[in-house]
Swiss-Prot record:
The chain crosses the membrane at residues 44-64, 99-119, 172-192, 199-219, 277-297, 312-332, 737-757, 780-800, 851-873, 877-899, 964-984, 999-1019. This is ABC transporter FPSE_09185. SUPFAM superfamilies: ABC transporter transmembrane region, P-loop containing nucleoside triphosphate hydrolases. ATP binds at residues 407-414, 1096-1103. Keywords: ATP-binding, Glycoprotein, Membrane, Nucleotide-binding, Repeat, Transmembrane, Transmembrane helix, Transport. One of its GO terms (cellular component) is mitochondrial inner membrane. Belongs to the ABC transporter superfamily. ABCB family. Multidrug resistance exporter (TC 3.A.1.201) subfamily. One of its GO terms (molecular function) is ATP hydrolysis activity. InterPro entries: AAA+_ATPase, ABC1_TM_dom, ABC1_TM_sf, ABC_transporter-like_ATP-bd, ABC_transporter-like_CS, P-loop_NTPase, Type_1_exporter. It comes from Fusarium pseudograminearum (strain CS3096).
Length: 1305
């Protein structure tokens, strides 16, 4: 908590933080140690217990060396003087020492179990705490800071980065403590026996420390660079998955994959560049380890010759201690690497956690009946100094009145909303890092988002600069006598009810979504019954109650990811209910009815009119029919007020801006009778109530029990099946596998040879004194030769396996994203495959798989060769002892390792499932940051996230108890095996069957073989995680193959002039994940070159036709057909078919890159499009002048420029037209545009329609009144069709919709 409090500093004009260069130099180790500051007192107690247990585990093996040394000494005495041996005393001593080893085994089992349980639990607890603090710190930042973050970084931080940190503070840290204590204890034991020999042996420590000091900084730097490139790639994948419909419509799969591959390849190359350095480190370390054993052996013989060491047991204790240090150092490699990666991960996470917080006010005054006053407000976004959004803006919003803000796109309307919501400030405008979590594109703002160019690395030190360097900020916004910046932020937002153009709903029940509006109010802690009553009242006010009650679960119906299971109008009414349930004093309606059809608009507008009667209201609208009754209308242009007044007074100025805006939206109603247009009040209210029920198609959601999503079950595969299938895709790496195998054979041969050399070393000490020096020199040289060979083998093994590992990771990432992008759209409709979940999988799953195919694979391979070599040499020198090892000890280690692996697999599957849930929740919340902020949901989101994490910790605690016991046994069983081998081998020596050399060779070979047998399955943690990840990857791959197999290579779409004829013949359809029929036997014909419009209430099936024409979904057999110039569209190859049509959706989506990149997004070969063609299309949609006015013109990065919603939409339209489609689909394509822009773009459409067929879905009827034919839908059927004039003459549903939107009555 202390560092959170320390971060808030500075004045209203300047926020000061430490110099960024100093921040960059902060030690990774310091940040790693800071992680432990999140531990509670109880956590520290558990840590102490776990650390003591780890130390105890580490000490057991050096104590075992003491026993072994004493036994060898006794065996040596027996061999030298067999006639004076007391057999009973020898057997008694043998039994005593064997029981002592059994005691060590039991103690090590207990301590290992405690160690594993404690470190695993604390690791999960600390990881959960860091994840929680990361999210909390992110939500405490200003909105524009989160706007500037690239998509996907949140998922990376909360999944892959946090997982890396968790590994480095849990079991791997415990392993590090264990082996460090082993090294220290081994040195202590050796030192007490012979300090001089120990000092010689300890030279190894200095040697390894020098190597590590050289290599680790290089590795850390390379790893940080890799993380940055990975984050860039994740951002590309994130955008693609969030905009998957647009990617499919544009056929931009390969473009996205190419862009993603560029970053993935860069990350791979950076990693592979450091692979030989890590290989050299490993080779040099193992050369030193084996070499120092030869040095210690040679020096020991010298000491023995001169009488300094008199007992061969002393030499054995020291030598085995050196060997133990050898093993301990070799085992330290992975823990050190894990801790190093955790240091980097901690630094990345703390960059966000430590980011300075914006100043917050503290006043909570009475604002009832107080006016809102804008006085000389000048505002520029931090990323756009010099580009004024508001320029000396002054106006007053009267208390209790409805003030409407109108004007063209980019005039500053939504910036005013941002200032009122305190998302931006006139006193401080910090520029914060691109190091944190991005916002999702699910929830956009239409005007002037502060999206900064992503030039620097994704993870960078926070930077704040003085406001005078970030753009002009002046003026004031006040309510009563109080400046908005002086008010307490959350309290102020709780006084505002905000309804945005693009409503965002959370993937929870309707009740929970509406009840979110009560957060931060006096009703937040009311009983559920009271809340339900308030929610129901609010829904009735918003005319949503009736359609909700018709759902299977009513208010408990879940709305899907982002509210995907609701129509646009349904979502908007839920959002309106959410905003009015808290009875706010101020209402802000930011295009609140833009997504609603004409009839629904009349209903909702009536609800809004009723809701705002006694409230101060700010209404932003492009559809001017919604603000005719406003008490005051403010007309904006270029950040200034150009006109003010009522609708009536402004319409008196025929040359005025407002008058021209109204004229642009007017509907021709010449065939209507004016006397009939106004209904009596009682009739109007009755009509509203009737329409609220009748126009709504039942919500297309499924009852979770009865009508669950129809998704294909995941294929269950064994670990072997998963990895064999993945290996099939790595045939091009067969040479790497071969080289790894050869190098692993060299590594595997080291241990059997070491056992033989060790036995020879023991025999040397019982040789005649004349031969001792000569033998000592010879065998010391043999140790040196072995060290050289082992160093070379380890160098190549590590280098090649790391290169393979990084290659596997890169190729898996690319194929994984490719398989995801090429899925059918129904794949993404399943709740378990939300964009947040898939982004987390893209970031995490390939990482898990690459770990198994790299060093872990090489380690397992060399372990197999080691076991085989050890068994061969033990059977050669002593077959009886070898058989005991083969038939008893090795099976024990293998079985215990198998059970360890099995429980670890189950644990990691549970771990992945829970963290996937929490990751999905966090990603969804970050994507809806504006909604979260406006509803003051930050605390609720944090608490819910913490509940998810706490639940995971508790589930992990229960599971970890059993896995810890099994782990403890598996990692201690080697001591039990040693007790058995020593006891049996001693009996063989005492009976004279074995010589000391035969026993020592067999004993050392069996013990080392047993150790490596356990290590084969010692990769359980990595393999367990990788197995689950591999299954998910293969499930996606198999699903994509099914899609590809379904792809037909039928007829080619003919390149015809003048458009195409579209026929829907007897079409029946329901969505794959929903059990509700959309159409039953629908027939519809659109002639070649026609401009057809589809209109009707929300949920009637208009947009579904667009989805079917785009082949987002295909009709099932015998459910009708859709014909393209007489050919069933299902007969065409889907990707080739989509090249001939373009889609412009209601919500414009622009991807990272330049404006030119976005315009050419749907073009297969962008280089083939001349620059003049790009300019021509942009001129047609009247965006060219805006683009060339930007500093970099068409090369302007989209993220570096805050484009208004209208500007974004015009770029999206240019993107559609440059493909020269035969069929142009417009799904509310002009709904985000102001009247002036709409008129311009409509003219562009009129020009574009001459050469193609055009189908438009529209709620704003003025945009389609010139259509050649208009189809009026209701409940999945065409109930009227004709031209605008013909339908008005019928005075039916269409006529009624026109009356609602008419502006000239």
């Amino acid at each position: 908590m202390a560092d959170h409090q320390a971060r808030q500093s500075g004045s209203s004009q300047r926020t000061v933080i430490p110099d960024p260069q100093l921040a960059k130099e902060k030690s990774n180790l310091t940040n790693y140690l800071r992680v432990f500051a999140y531990a509670t007192r109880w956590d520290f107690c558990v840590y102490v217990v776990g650390a003591l247990a780890s130390i105890g585990v580490g000490v057991t093996m050096p104590l075992m060396n003491v026993v072994l040394g004493q036994l060898v000494g006794d065996f040596s005495d027996t061999v030298q003087d067999p006639y004076n041996m007391d057999l009973n005393n020898f057997k008694s001593m043998l039994q005593k020492q064997s029981l002592y080893i059994v005691g060590l085994f039991l103690g090590r089992w207990l301590l290992n179990s405690i160690n594993k349980f404690c470190f695993r639990m604390i690791g999960i607890r600390l990881s959960s705490a860091i994840r929680h603090h990361y999210l909390r710190s992110l939500f405490a930042q200003s909105i524009h800071v989160i706007d500037s973050m690239p998509p996907g970084a949140a998922a990376t931080a909360i999944t892959a980065t946090s997982n890396t940190l968790q590994i480095g503070v849990s079991e791997r840290l415990g392993t590090f403590v264990t082996y460090v204590s082993t090294i220290i204890a081994a040195i202590a034991v050796a030192f007490t026996r012979s300090w001089s020999l120990t000092i010689v042996s300890a030279s190894l420590l200095v040697y390894i420390a020098i190597i590590i000091a050289i290599v680790v900084p290089i590795y850390l730097k390379a790893n940080a660079a890799t993380l940055k490139a990975d984050a860039q790639g994740t951002a590309v994948a994130s955008e693609a998955l969030q905009g998957i419909r647009l990617v499919n419509a544009c056929g931009a799969h390969e473009r996205i994959i190419s862009k993603y591959s560029k970053w993935v390849t860069k990350a791979m190359e950076r990693s592979q560049r450091v692979a030989p350095i890590i290989g050299a480190q490993t080779g040099l370390v193992f050369f030193g380890i084996f070499g120092v054993f030869g040095l210690a052996f040679w020096y020991g013989t010298q000491q023995f010759i001169h009488g300094v060491i008199k007992n061969v047991g002393v030499v054995i204790i020291v030598l085995t201690s050196v060997m133990l240090i050898l093993f301990a150092f070799s085992y330290l490699e992975q823990p050190i690497m894990a801790i190093s990666q955790a240091m980097v991960a901690a630094t990345e996470l703390f960059k966000v956690i430590d980011a300075p917080l914006p100043p917050m006010g503290s006043f909570t005054p009475d604002i009832n009946s107080k006016d809102l006053i804008f006085k000389d407000v000048t505002f520029e976004y931090p990323s756009r100094p010099g580009a004024r959004v508001l320029d000396g803006l002054s106006f007053r919003i009267q208390a209790g009145q409805n003030t409407a803000l109108v004007g063209p796109s980019g005039s500053g309307k939504s910036t005013i909303v941002g200032l009122l919501e305190r998302w931006y400030s006139l006193k401080h405008s910090p520029v914060l890092p691109e190091a944190a979590t991005p916002r999702s594109s699910k929830e956009g703002e239409r005007d002037n988002h502060d999206e900064r160019k992503y030039e620097r690395s994704t993870y960078e030190v926070p930077i704040m600069v003085p406001t005078n360097l970030t753009g002009a900020l002046s003026g004031s916004i006040s309510i009563g006598a109080h400046d908005l910046d002086d008010l307490e932020g959350k309290w102020w937002r709780a006084q505002i009810g905000l309804v945005q153009q693009e409503p965002f709903l959370f993937n929870s029940s309707i009740f929970e979504n509406v009840a979110n509006g009560l957060l931060g109010t006096v009703w937040e802690n009311e009983s559920e019954a009271k809340k339900r009553k308030m929610v129901q009242d609010a829904c009735q006010e918003a005319y949503a109650h009736e359609f909700i009650c018709r759902l299977p679960d009513a208010y408990d119906t879940r709305v899907g990811d982002g509210g995907a299971k609701l129509s646009g109008g349904q979502k908007q009414r839920i959002a309106i209910a959410r905003s009015i349930v808290k009875r706010p004093q101020i209402m802000i309606l930011d295009e609140a009815t833009s997504a609603i059809d004409a009839k629904s608009e009349k209903i909702v507008q009536a609800a809004l009119d009723r809701a705002i009667k006694t409230r101060t209201t700010i209404t932003i609208a492009h559809r001017l029919s919604t603000i005719q009754k406003a008490d005051h209308i403010v007309v904006l242009s270029k950040g200034r007020v150009v006109e003010e007044g009522t609708h009536k007074s402004l319409m008196e100025h025929e040359n005025g801006v407002y008058y021209s805006l109204v004229e642009a939206q007017s509907l021709r109603l010449s065939t209507t009778d004016d006397t009939d247009s106004d209904l009596p009040a009682t009739t109007y209210v009755a009509e509203l109530k009737s329409a609220a029920v009748d126009i709504e198609q039942p919500l297309e959601v499924q009852n979770d029990e009865d009508n669950g999503p129809v998704v294909e079950p995941e294929v269950l595969r064994t670990l072997t099946q998963s990895f064999v299938k993945l290996l099939e895709g790595l045939r091009d790496q067969s040479s790497s596998f071969l080289l790894i195998t050869i190098a692993s054979m060299g590594v595997g041969a080291a241990t059997p040879l070491q056992a033989w050399l060790f036995a020879k070393a023991v025999i040397v000490f019982i040789s005649p004194s004349d031969d001792l020096k000569k033998e000592g020199d010879f065998w010391g040289f043999m140790w040196l030769a072995l060290a050289g060979g082992v160093g070379v083998a380890y160098f190549f093994q590590c280098w090649i396996s790391l290169r393979l590992q990084y290659h596997v990771g890169a190729t898996t990432k690319q194929s994984y994203l490719r398989d995801m992008l090429y899925q059918e759209l129904s794949f993404f409709d399943d709740d378990s495959r939300s964009s947040g979940t898939l982004i987390g999988r893209i970031a995490g799953d390939p990482k898990q798989v690459e770990g198994v195919f790299g060093l872990n694979l090489a380690s397992a391979t060399s372990s197999v060769f080691t076991i085989v070599g050890c068994l061969i040499i033990s059977l050669t020198f002593g077959w009886k002892l070898g058989l005991v090892g083969l038939c008893v000890t090795v099976p024990i280690m293998m079985v215990s390792g198998f059970w360890k692996f099995r429980h670890e697999l189950q644990f990691d599957q549970m771990n992945a499932a829970v963290f996937a849930e929490s990751s999905q929740f966090a990603s969804e919340a970050i994507g809806a940051m504006r909604t979260v902020s406006s509803l003051t949901m930050e605390s609720a989101i944090n608490n819910r996230y913490k509940q998810l994490l706490d639940g995971h910790v508790e589930a992990a605690r229960r599971k970890a108890q059993w896995t810890a016991v099994i782990f403890g046994f598996a990692e201690s069983a080697t001591l039990g095996c040693q007790a058995l081998i020593l006891w049996y081998g001693g009996r063989l020596i005492s009976s004279g069957e074995y010589s000391l050399e035969a026993f020592m060779v067999s004993y050392m070979a069996i013990i080392n073989g047993v150790e490596y047998a356990g290590q084969i399955l010692g990769v359980a943690p990595s393999a367990a995680q990788a197995a689950a990840a591999a299954n998910r990857i293969l499930d996606v791959q198999d699903s994509n193959r099914s899609s590809q197999e379904a792809e037909k290579s039928g007829p080619t779409v003919e390149d015809t002039d003048g458009g195409v004829e579209i026929e829907l013949c007897n079409v029946s359809f329901k969505y794959p994940t929903r059990n509700v029929s959309i159409y039953k036997n629908l027939d519809l014909t659109i002639k070649k070159g026609q401009y057809a419009a589809l209109v009707g209430p929300s949920g009637c099936g208009k947009t579904t036709i667009i989805s079917l024409l785009e082949r987002f979904y295909d009709l099932e057999p015998n459910h009708g057909e859709i014909l393209w110039n007489g050919t069933n569209i299902n007969d065409f190859g889907v990707y080739q078919y989509r090249e001939h049509l373009s889609l412009v959706s209601q919500e414009p989506i622009l991807f990272r890159g330049t404006i030119r990149d976005n315009i050419l997004f749907g073009v297969a070969d962008p280089s083939s499009v001349p620059e003049e063609r790009i300019h021509e299309v942009c001129r047609d949609v009247f965006i060219h002048d805006v683009i060339v006015s930007l500093p970099d013109g068409y090369n302007t990065e989209v993220g570096a420029m805050s484009l208004s919603g209208g500007q974004k939409q015009r770029i999206a339209i240019a993107r559609a037209l440059i493909r020269n489609p035969k069929l142009l689909l417009l799904d509310e394509a002009t709904s985000a545009l102001d009247s002036e822009s709409e008129k311009i773009v409509q003219a562009a459409f009129e020009k574009a329609r001459k050469r193609r067929t055009m189908i438009a879905v529209a709620h704003r009827l003025a945009t389609i009144q010139d259509a050649d034919i208009i189809f009026v839908f209701d409940q999945g059927m065409v109930v009227e069709k004709g031209t605008h004039g013909e339908l008005l003459q019928k005075r039916g549903i269409y006529w009624d919709m026109c009356q609602t939107q008419a502006l000239d009555q």
